[in-house]
Amino acid sequence: AIGPVADLHI
């Protein structure tokens, strides 16, 4: 995504 930790929960 765009945020700093927006993709860690995948």
Swiss-Prot record:
One of its GO terms (cellular component) is extracellular region. Optimum pH is 5.3. GO terms for biological process: lignin catabolic process. Binds 4 Cu cations per monomer. Its main location: secreted. Keywords: Copper, Glycoprotein, Lignin degradation, Metal-binding, Oxidoreductase, Secreted. It catalyses: 4 hydroquinone + O2 = 4 benzosemiquinone + 2 H2O. Its cofactor is Cu cation. The keyword Secreted applies. Optimum temperature is 60 degrees Celsius. The keyword Cell cycle does not apply. It is an enzyme of class 1 (oxidoreductase). Its EC number is 1.10.3.2. On the 2D-gel the determined pI of this protein is: 4.56, its MW is: 62.03 kDa. Lignin degradation and detoxification of lignin-derived products. Belongs to the multicopper oxidase family. This is Laccase-2.
